[in-house]
Amino acid sequence: MHLTSREQEKLMLFLAGELAAKRKARGVKLNYPETVAYIASHLQEAARDGVSVAEVMQYGSTLLTVDDVMEGVAEMVHEVQIEATFPDGTKLVTVHNPIR
């Protein structure tokens, strides 16, 4: 199987997001890379499921709270931006201040 660079990046993002989800489920507070991966991977999956761009952006701000992340991480994550594959093509999705 040959994966393009873009496909490799998507796969790495998915794996990092899965690891972050497992840690969150165990009650471990997420660090910066885990936080971004968790949000980004959930956004990718929502887009792939056919959710609209606006709904994906709104969904991104409901995934984590300040209680889910390590101290200071919420202030560091001003936005999460991904290129997501929707049924009608690839689009840029930006979630501003995703941790509330």
From Swiss-Prot:
Listed Pfam families: Urease_gamma
Catalysed reactions listed for this entry: urea + 2 H2O + H(+) = hydrogencarbonate + 2 NH4(+)
Enzyme class of the recorded protein, top EC level: hydrolase
Principal location: cytoplasm
CDD domains, sorted: Urease_gamma (cd00390)
Species annotation: Haemophilus influenzae (strain PittGG)
Gene3D superfamilies: Urease, gamma-like subunit (3.30.280.10)
Protein's name in the database: Urease subunit gamma
Taxonomic superkingdom: Bacteria
Gene Ontology molecular-function annotations: nickel cation binding; urease activity
The encoding gene: ureA
Cellular location(s): Cytoplasm
Quaternary state and interactors: Heterotrimer of UreA (gamma), UreB (beta) and UreC (alpha) subunits. Three heterotrimers associate to form the active enzyme.
EC number(s) per entry: 3.5.1.5
HAMAP family noted in UniProt: Urease_gamma
UniProt GO BP: urea catabolic process
Keywords: Cytoplasm, Hydrolase
Pathway of action: Nitrogen metabolism; urea degradation; CO(2) and NH(3) from urea (urease route): step 1/1
Gene Ontology cellular component annotations, sorted alphabetically: cytoplasm
Family named by the database record: Belongs to the urease gamma subunit family.
